[in-house]
Amino acid sequence: MATKRKIKDDVLFRKNKILAYERSGGMCELCRCRPAQEVHHIVYRSHLGTSILSNLACLCLQCHNEAHGVNAKEIRKHLLDVVGVEQS
């Protein structure tokens, strides 16, 4: 059974993924070369990241795979800069 936190975050995600696509202009926010096809949580939900707009990045399939790969930490830092979020 889903927790209240997850249900609330799912509702927020549905709303903010549209805003994230608008912000990106439909392009991948990492490579800026290909159309965005997926919305990525910069701070993973499994690490208690939420679906606030500043934690979402629109990525193409290739960049989304890279964002979960061996360079995930560096990509995360770059995406935080791209979407205009200061790191704590």
Q: Predicted regions: what is each one?
A:
Residues 66:
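A contiguous, mid-protein "functional segment" used to position or interact
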Residues 1-36, 73-88:
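A boundary/linker detector
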